[in-house]
From Swiss-Prot:
It catalyses: RNA(n) + a ribonucleoside 5'-triphosphate = RNA(n+1) + diphosphate. It comes from the Eukaryota. This is DNA-directed RNA polymerase subunit beta''. CDD domains: RNAP_beta'_C (cd02655). Its cofactor is Zn(2+). One of its GO terms (molecular function) is DNA binding. GO terms for cellular component: chloroplast; DNA-directed RNA polymerase complex; mitochondrion. SUPFAM superfamilies: beta and beta-prime subunits of DNA dependent RNA-polymerase. DNA-dependent RNA polymerase catalyzes the transcription of DNA into RNA using the four ribonucleoside triphosphates as substrates. Its EC number is 2.7.7.6. Keywords: Chloroplast, DNA-directed RNA polymerase, Metal-binding, Nucleotidyltransferase, Plastid, Transcription, Transferase, Zinc. Zn(2+) binds at residues 220, 293, 300, 303.
Length: 1379
C-alpha cells in the first residue's frame, strides 16, 4: 500500500451509490477479508462522528424554498387561463384535466429539484438535508412534503385527485387540504395492513414452486443460448440494464471480433469483460440461462452462472430455487411499507421538452408533418420520422433532430425566442406507469337544444340508438331555452316562431305523463250520423289528446277518444281546418282502450297528398281467436300504396291492406297453437278431442274438434277445427268440393233426413289417407259492412261559402287478404277491419308541386276553459329555394331532405320582426325522437341578447365593404377551424347584406323573390373551403345561403394574402365568446345569430362543448336536453399512482397466468389457424414440436420482462436469473393433445416438456402436445412429489388421489425431506441424498421386474427408470469422483 504522505485527499460526499462502488473496487483489488477490515474502520469512524455531531431534528430546521411563492402563483395563473379556454370551448374536459395535472405535477417536481441546491447553498449542515440525502433516514419525497408542497394526492384506488395540496406540512394545511391528505394517510395504513400479507403469501407460493431446484451438475451440455442485444427492434435497451443482464452469466458461444476470439464458450462474464464487449460494439451476445438448461428438476452451474454472494460460479448443492423465490418476494414485502411513509402522494410523468438554444427563425420540411392536437388541446404538428429542425439566427445556424411520434409546437418560418419550447417528446421515457382506460362523462350545464356541425356523424352508431360518433374534432352547441310539454303551455295558440307571454310559463316538466278518461264514457261509434244531426247549445264535450305515442318508428300516433253524444265541432276555412280535443288531467293512471280514434301525425308535422290522417279500430270487427278470412265477392282487391300503410301498434304486424268493395266478409274460427320442436304432444293427428283436453304438459284446448298437427321448421303448428264431421256417400255433390261457403237455405240432401241451414257454413274436405276422406262442416261468423260516411255533414255550413280544397275521405280496409289465416299471439285480439281518414287537397297551380299540409297543436283559452285543437293548414313550402351546404352557386335546386335545418319555416313572420321585449318569448316547436311527447322550446329575453345598433353600416344597392388593411392574414386562417364559426380576431366590419327592399326573416336574409342579389365589382369571391369563384360583375348572382362565410378578395391580391376583408353575418351562424364582430365592440357571450336587422343583431345564448375524435355524442340533432343530461362520453387513458401496491397484483397476475386483458376472438382464430397451417406444412411431429417450442420461448421472455417492468418502476433491482427460474417452472409443462394418439400418454395429461421430447425420441413415435402456462399455484400442485403438494394446499384431496394412483415420492426436493425429518438434498446433505435416492431407484426397479405386471405399465416404468438410473449414474461417475 502506498505511503500515507502520497495519498490524495478527496473532499466529496459519499452517499449509498459511492459506497457500493468503493466496496466493489476494494473486493476486486484486495479480496474479501481485507475489504471487511476496511469497512469495519469506516463503520467505527461513522459512529464516532455521529456521536460527536449529535444531530437532532427541530421544527426550525424545516426551511421553506423561497421560490415556492411565485411558482405556485404561476401554476394558478396557468390554471385560470385553462379554465377560460374550457369555457370558450377551445379544450374539452379531459384535456383540461390532463393539463391541470401536468401543471401541478411539474410545479411540485420543480420544487423538489430546487430543494437540494437550496439547502446546499443556505445551510449545508442542516439535519433535514443531511438525513434525507445521505440515504440513512428518510428520502427526498418525505422532505419535499415537509418543506416543498404535498402536490397531487391519490385516493385509495390509486386514482389521482385533481385538486392539489399547495401547502407543505411546515406551513400547515387548510381544511380541504387536510381532508384530501387523509385519503393518503388512510391508503398508507390500509396498504401496510392488507398488502403486506398479500406480499407474504406471494413469497410462500414462489418458494413452493421452486423449492426443489438445486445445482446438481457442472454442465448439462446444452448448445442453446439466449441472444442479448443492446439494440432491439422496438427500442434501445439502456446500458445499465444491459450490463445488469450480462454480469454473472456464462457465454453460450464464442465471441469473435473479426477473426479474433475475444471470449470463449462457457466463460463467465465479469464487469471487465462486459465493458470490453461494449467497447468493441458487439451486436449480440449469446448467454446461457436457466431456460436453456437441459435438466428437468435441477440446474447446472454454467446455466445458472455466478453466485450473487461471492461473485464466483455457484457451488454444487446450492438451493438456488429458494434463493430465487425469496429474492422476488422480499422486495414486495418491504415496498408495501413505503406507501405508509410517503402517504399516497401521486407520482406521474411529464413529457420531455426541446427548447430553442437562442433567438431565431424556425425552418423545417412541412411535407413530413401533419397538423394535430396535443393531449392538452394545443395545435401542433406530428412527425412520423426523424425530423430535422433548423434554427437560423443572424450568425449561427443550429440543427435539432426531433425523434418520431413527437409534437412540434411551432410553425414553419416562425420567430422563436431563447428557451422557448419548440417540441415535446413522449417516446423514450422508460419509467413504467400504470395506465387504464377511463370513461369521462360530460354533462350539460344548462337546458336547451343540441346543435352540432357537419363534422358529427348524423347517423347513429347502432340502429335506434342515440349515440353518434365523431370522425373529427367538432363543437357541440347547447342553445338556451326553457322547454314545456304541449299540454302545459297555457293560454296560447302556439305555432312555430309565435310569441307569447312568459309569466304563465311557471310549470316545467321533464316528461309528460299519460292522460286518460273513464272507460264507460267511451263511444263505440265513429263518425255516425249522430254527429251531424244534433245541434246543441252550450259547450260540448271533447275527447282528450293522449300522451301515449305508438311504437312506430316513423309517425306519432295519438289516441283520441270521442265521448258519447258529442259533436265533432270542427271549424273549416279554405286551406285549413281545426279539430278540437278536450284536456282532462285527472285519473292519470287509467288504461286507454284502443277503440278510440288514433290521429297519426308524421314526425315532421308535414302531410303528403293522400296520406292517412286518422284511423279507427271498430271493436265489432275484433276477434280473440285465430281463423281464416273469406270475402263475399272476390273482385275487390285494390291494394293501397305502400306509403299509406299504417304500422300496427300491437304485437304483430299487419299485411297489406285491401280496400273493401263488398258488403260482407266471413271469418272461420280455429284454435291454433305454435309449439317448440321438442314439445311432447299428448294427442294424435286427425283425432277428435273435447273441450279442456290436455294437449301438452301445460296446455289445454279451449274448444273441441278435430286435431291437425303440422311439423314445420323448428316448430310444430297444432290446429283444432270445431264443427261437424260427415262421412258422405258417393251421391253427395258436396263431397267433391273443398273450402267452399254455403249460404243459409241450401240444405244437405240425404236419404234419411233433410233440413235447411240457418247460418253460413264452411265445408272442408279432410283426407287422412289416400283412400279415406270425410267432410268437416265448420261454423262461420258473418260480418256486414255499413256504407261509407259522408263527411260533408261533419262541418257546419261556413258563412263565407269558400271553395273547399282540403278533403277528408273515409276508407275501410280489411287488414288481411282473402283466404289468409289470422294468428292471435297469446291474448291479443285481432282487428279485421280498420276505418281510415285520408287527407287530400286540390292543387291550385298544376305546375307547382310544393304545396303541403302542416299540422300544429293549438290550445285556446275561452273564458277560462282550455281547449286543444289540431290545426291542419295548407301552406306553400319555401324548401325548394334552399340549396345544399357546400354546393357551388350553379348546382341547381335540391329537395327539402338535404337541407341542414336551423329553424322551422313559418309562413307568417311579421311578429318575429319585432324586437324582443322582456315579457315576450318565442316558441320553437320540437318533435322528440323518443316519441314520449311533443315539446316546445320557449326563448325568452334572458336567452337572447342584442348587439348594436352599429354606426358603420351604409345602405347602397352595391355592397359596401369596410376595409381593414392587414396584409399578414392568410386565407387559410380566415375561415373557422371547425367550419361553423369564423375567426374574427382581425375582422372589424359588420356588413349585413341589404338592398332597396325591407328584409323579412325566415331562415336567412330573405330578399325579394327569395334570391340573393349581389353586385361584386372587380372582386373574386372565396367560400369557406378556399375555392375562388370569378363572378361576372354585370350579372345577378344567386349565392348559397348555407355558406356561412364569404370573403371578398380584391383583384390585385398576391401570394394568397387577403388585402381586403369583410364580415357577413349569416342567420344561424355560431359565435364563440370574446371575439369581435363589430368595430371596437367585443362579443361578450357565445351564441347563435337569431335575428338580423338593419343595424343590429339578436343572438341566442349558446354554450359550446368541444369534442374530439373517438368521443361519443349522446342525443340527436335538435333534441331538447335538460340540465344534467349526458352530453358526450370521452374514452381516454389515465395514469394511476405508481406505487408497489398497484404493481404487486400485476406481478401476481403474471405469475398466476390470469388474463389481464381480454383477447379478441379474431386473434384466437388467427392463432388456431396458424397452428393448423404449420402442422399441415411441417407434418404432425415437427409442427407440434416447433409450435410448442416457439410459444414457450416467446412467452418466457415476455413474462420476465413484464415482472421486471413492475419492480424497476419502484427502483428495485432483481437479477433476471431469479425470475427466470420461477418462469421456467410455470412454462415447463405441456398438454398432450388428441391429434396423434400415442400409446404412452393420455390426451389432456400434463407432462414435462423435456420428458415429452425424450420419450418421443426413445419410442421413435410422434407425441402431439401444445404449450400451456400453469401459474405458480397449479405448478406447485403438479409436481413429482405428492408430499410437497399436500403440504402446500388441498391436503386431503392430494393424498387421496396419490393413494388411489399408487404414487411414489422419491424425496428429491427439500420440502419432502423437511416434512419427513430427513437430510435435505442441498448443501452438505447434497451427496447423501442423491446416493440414497439412486440406491432406492435400483431396488424398486428390480422388485418391479420380478412381479408380473401388465405389458403397458412395465414398458412405461422401464423407460422412466432407465432414464433416471442413467442420469444418476452419470452424475455420480463424472462429478462426484472429483469432489
Amino acid at each position: 500500500m502506498a505511503e500515507r504522505a502520497n495519498l490524495v485527499f478527496h473532499n466529496k460526499v459519499i452517499d449509498g451509490t459511492a459506497i457500493k462502488r468503493l466496496i466493489s473496487r476494494l473486493i476486486d483489488h484486495f479480496g474479501m477479508a481485507y475489504t471487511s477490515h476496511i469497512l469495519d474502520q469506516v463503520k467505527t469512524l461513522g459512529f464516532q462522528q455521529a456521536t460527536a455531531t449529535s444531530i437532532s431534528l427541530g421544527i426550525d430546521d424545516l426551511l421553506t424554498i423561497p421560490s415556492k411563492g411565485w411558482l405556485v402563483q404561476d401554476a394558478e395563473q396557468q390554471s385560470l387561463i385553462l379554465e377560460k379556454h374550457h369555457h370558450y370551448g377551445n379544450v374539452h374536459a379531459v384535456e383540461k384535466l390532463r393539463q391541470s395535472i401536468e401543471i401541478w405535477y411539474a410545479t411540485s417536481e420543480y420544487l423538489r429539484q430546487e430543494m437540494n441546491p437550496n439547502f446546499r447553498m443556505t445551510d449545508p449542515l442542516n439535519p433535514v438535508h443531511m438525513m434525507s440525502f445521505s440515504g440513512a433516514r428518510g428520502n427526498a419525497s418525505q422532505v419535499h412534503q415537509l418543506v416543498g408542497m404535498r402536490g397531487l394526492m391519490s385516493d385509495p384506488q390509486g386514482q389521482m385527485i385533481d385538486l392539489p395540496i399547495q401547502s407543505n406540512l411546515r406551513e400547515g394545511l387548510s381544511l380541504t387540504e387536510y381532508i384530501i391528505s387523509c385519503y393518503g394517510a388512510r391508503k398508507g395504513v390500509v396498504d401496510t395492513a392488507v398488502r403486506t400479507s398479500d406480499a407474504g403469501y406471494l413469497t410462500r407460493r414462489l418458494v413452493e414452486v421452486v423449492q426443489h431446484i438445486v445445482v446438481r451438475r457442472t454442465d448439462c451440455g446444452t448448445i442453446r443460448g439466449i441472444s442479448v442485444s443492446p439494440r432491439n427492434k422496438n427500442r434501445m435497451m439502456s446500458e445499465r440494464i444491459f450490463i445488469q443482464t450480462l454480469i454473472g452469466r456464462v457465454l453460450a458461444d464464442d465471441i469473435y471480433i473479426g477473426s479474433r476470439c475475444v471470449a470463449f464458450r462457457n466463460q463467465d462474464l465479469g464487469i471487465g469483460l462486459v465493458n470490453r464487449l461494449i467497447t468493441f460494439g458487439t451486436q449480440s451476445i449469446s448467454i446461457r440461462t436457466p431456460f436453456t438448461c437441459r435438466s428437468t428438476s435441477w440446474i447446472c452451474r454454467l446455466c445458472y452462472g455466478r453466485s450473487p454472494t461471492h461473485g464466483d460460479l455457484v457451488e454444487l448443492g446450492e438451493a438456488v430455487g429458494i434463493i430465487a423465490g425469496q429474492s422476488i418476494g422480499e422486495p414486495g414485502t418491504q415496498l408495501t411499507l413505503r406507501t405508509f411513509h410517503t402517504g399516497g402522494v401521486f407520482t406521474g410523468g411529464t413529457a420531455e421538452h426541446v427548447r430553442a438554444p437562442y433567438n431565431g427563425k424556425i425552418k423545417f420540411n412541412e411535407d413530413l408533418v401533419h397538423p394535430t392536437r396535443t393531449r392538452h388541446g394545443h395545435p401542433a404538428f406530428l412527425c412520423y420520422i426523424d425530423l430535422s429542425v433548423i434554427i437560423e439566427s443572424e450568425d449561427i445556424i443550429h440543427s435539432v433532430t426531433i425523434p418520431p411520434k413527437s409534437f412540434l409546437l411551432v410553425q414553419n418560418d416562425q420567430y422563436v425566442e431563447s428557451e422557448q419550447v419548440i417540441a415535446e417528446i413522449r417516446e423514450g421515457t422508460h419509467t413504467f406507469h400504470f395506465k387504464e382506460r377511463v370513461r369521462k362523462y360530460i354533462y350539460s350545464d344548462s337546458e336547451g337544444e343540441m346543435h352540432w356541425s357537419t363534422d358529427v356523424s348524423h347517423a347513429p352508431e347502432f340502429t335506434y340508438s342515440n349515440v353518434h360518433l365523431l370522425p373529427k374534432t367538432s363543437h357541440l352547441w347547447i342553445l338556451s331555452g326553457g322547454s314545456c310539454g304541449s299540454s302545459l303551455i297555457l293560454f296560447s295558440i302556439h305555432k312555430d316562431q309565435d310569441q307569447m307571454n312568459i309569466p304563465f310559463l311557471s310549470v316545467e316538466r321533464k316528461s309528460i305523463s299519460s292522460l286518460s278518461v273513464n272507460n264507460d264514457q267511451v263511444s263505440q261509434n265513429f263518425l255516425s250520423s249522430d254527429f251531424a244531426d244534433k245541434k246543441k247549445s252550450g259547450i260540448p264535450h271533447y275527447s282528450e289528446l293522449n300522451g301515449n305515442l305508438g311504437t312506430s318508428h316513423y309517425n306519432f300516433i295519438y289516441s283520441a277518444i270521442f265521448h258519447e253524444n258529442s259533436d265533432l265541432l270542427a271549424k273549416r276555412r279554405r286551406n285549413r281546418f281545426l279539430i278540437p280535443f278536450q284536456s282532462i288531467q285527472e285519473q292519470e293512471k287509467e288504461f286507454i282502450p284502443h277503440s278510440g280514434i288514433s290521429i297519426e301525425i308524421p314526425i315532421n308535422g308535414i302531410f303528403r297528398r293522400n296520406s292517412i290522417f286518422a284511423f279507427f279500430d271498430d271493436p265489432r270487427y275484433r276477434r280473440k281467436s285465430s281463423g281464416i278470412l273469406k270475402y263475399g265477392t272476390l273482385k275487390a282487391d285494390s291494394i293501397i300504396q305502400k306509403e299509406d300503410m299504417i304500422e300496427y301498434r300491437g304485437v304483430q304486424k299487419f299485411k297489406t291492406k285491401y280496400e273493401m268493395k263488398v258488403d260482407r266478409f266471413f271469418f272461420i274460427p280455429e284454435e291454433v297453437h305454435i309449439l317448440p320442436e321438442s314439445s311432447a304432444i299428448m294427442v294424435q293427428n286427425y283425432s277428435i278431442i273435447g273441450v279442456d283436453t290436455r294437449i301438452t304438459l301445460n296446455l289445454r284446448s279451449r274448444v273441441g274438434g278435430l286435431i291437425r298437427v303440422e311439423r314445420k321448421k323448428k316448430r310444430i303448428e297444432l290446429k283444432i277445427f270445431s264443427g261437424d264431421i260427415h262421412f258422405p256417400d258417393k251421391t253427395d255433390k258436396i263431397s267433391r268440393h273443398s273450402g267452399i261457403l254455403i249460404p243459409p237455405g241450401r240444405g244437405k240432401t240425404n236419404s234419411k233426413e233433410s233440413k235447411k241451414l240457418k247460418n253460413w257454413i264452411y265445408v272442408q274436405r279432410i283426407t287422412p289417407t289416400k283412400k279415406k276422406f270425410f267432410v268437416l262442416v265448420r261454423p262461420v261468423a258473418t260480418y256486414e259492412i255499413a256504407d261509407s260516411i259522408n263527411l260533408a255533414t261533419l262541418f257546419p255550413q261556413d258563412l263565407f261559402q269558400e271553395k273547399d280544397n282540403i278533403q277528408l275521405r273515409v276508407f275501410n280496409y280489411i287488414l288481411y287478404g282473402n283466404g289468409k289465416p289470422t294468428r292471435g299471439i297469446s291474448d291479443t285480439s285481432i282487428q279485421l277491419v280498420r276505418t281510415c281518414l285520408v287527407l287530400n287537397w286540390d292543387q291550385e297551380n298544376k305546375n307547382s308541386s310544393v304545396e303541403e299540409v302542416r299540422a300544429f297543436f293549438v290550445e285556446v283559452s275561452t273564458k277560462g276553459l282550455i281547449r286543444d285543437f289540431i290545426r291542419i293548414g295548407l301552406v306553400k313550402s319555401h324548401m325548394s329555394y334552399i340549396r345544399k351546404r357546400n354546393n357551388t352557386p350553379d348546382s341547381g335546386l335540391i329537395s327539402a331532405d338535404n337541407m341542414n335545418p336551423v329553424y322551422s319555416i313559418s309562413p307568417k313572420v311579421g311578429i318575429f320582426q319585432q324586437s324582443l321585449r322582456q315579457n315576450h318569448g318565442t316558441i320553437r316547436m320540437f318533435l322528440n325522437r323518443n316519441k314520449e311527447s311533443q315539446s316546445l322550446l320557449i326563448l325568452s329575453a334572458s336567452n337572447c341578447f342584442r348587439i348594436g345598433p352599429f354606426n358603420h353600416v351604409k345602405y347602397h344597392n352595391v355592397i359596401n365593404q369596410s376595409i381593414k388593411k392587414n396584409p399578414l392574414i392568410t386565407i387559410k386562417n380566415s375561415p373557422g377551424p371547425l367550419g361553423t364559426s369564423i375567426q374574427i380576431s382581425n375582422f372589424f366590419s359588420f356588413l349585413p347584406l341589404l338592398t332597396y327592399n325591407l328584409i323579412s326573416v325566415i331562415k336567412y336574409l330573405q330578399l325579394d323573390n327569395l334570391k340573393y342579389i349581389f353586385q361584386v365589382i372587380n372582386s373574386y369571391l372565396i367560400d369557406e373551403n378556399g375555392r375562388i369563384f370569378n363572378l361576372d360583375p354585370y350579372n345577378n348572382v344567386v349565392l348559397n345561403p348555407f355558406k356561412l362565410n364569404w370573403y371578398f378578395l380584391h383583384k390585385n391580391y398576391h401570394h394568397n394574402y387577403c388585402e381586403e376583408t369583410s364580415t357577413i353575418i349569416s342567420l344561424g351562424q355560431f359565435f364563440c365568446e370574446n371575439v369581435c364582430i363589430a368595430k371596437n365592440e367585443p362579443h361578450l357571450k357565445s351564441g347563435q345569430v337569431l335575428i338580423v336587422q338593419r343595424d343590429s343583431v339578436v343572438i341566442r345564448s349558446a354554450k359550446p362543448y368541444l369534442a374530439t375524435p373517438g368521443a361519443k355524442v349522446h342525443g340527436h340533432y335538435r333534441e331538447i336536453l335538460y340540465e344534467g343530461d349526458t352530453l358526450v362520453t370521452f374514452i381516454y387513458e389515465k395514469s394511476r399512482s405508481g406505487d408497489i401496491t398497484q404493481g404487486l397484483p400485476k406481478v401476481e397476475q403474471v405469475l398466476e397466468v390470469r388474463a389481464i386483458d381480454s383477447i379478441s376472438l379474431n386473434l384466437e382464430k388467427r392463432i388456431k389457424g396458424w397452428n393448423k397451417c404449420i402442422t399441415r406444412i411441417l407434418g404432425i411431429p415437427w409442427g407440434f414440436l416447433i409450435g410448442a417450442e416457439l410459444t414457450i420461448v416467446q412467452s418466457r421472455i415476455s413474462l420476465v420482462n413484464k415482472i421486471q417492468k413492475v419492480y424497476r418502476s419502484q427502483g428495485v433491482q432483481i437479477h433476471n436469473r431469479h425470475i427466470e427460474i420461477i418462469v421456467r417452472q410455470i412454462t415447463s409443462k405441456v398438454l398432450v393433445s388428441e391429434e396423434g394418439m400415442s400409446n404412452v400418454f393420455l390426451p389432456g395429461e400434463l407432462i414435462g416438456l423435456l420428458r415429452a421430447e425424450r420419450t418421443g425420441r426413445a419410442l421413435e413415435e410422434a407425441i402431439c402436445y401444445r404449450a400451456v402456462l400453469l401459474g405458480i399455484t397449479r405448478a406447485s400442485l403438479n409436481t413429482q412429489s405428492f408430499i410437497s403438494e399436500a403440504s402446500f394446499q388441498e391436503t386431503s384431496r392430494v393424498l387421496a388421489k396419490a393413494a388411489l394412483r399408487g404414487r411414489i415420492d422419491w424425496l428429491k426436493g427439500l420440502k419432502e425431506n423437511v416434512v419427513l425429518g430427513g437430510v435435505i438434498p442441498a448443501g452438505t446433505g447434497f451427496n447423501k441424498g442423491l446416493v440414497h435416492c439412486s440406491r432406492q431407484y435400483t431396488n424398486i426397479l428390480l422388485e418391479k421386474k420380478k412381479k408380473n405386471l401388465s405389458l403397458f405399465e412395465g414398458d412405461m416404468r422401464d423407460i422412466l427408470f432407465y432414464h433416471r438410473e442413467f442420469c444418476d449414474s452419470s452424475i455420480s461417475k463424472s462429478d462426484f469422483s472429483r469432489i
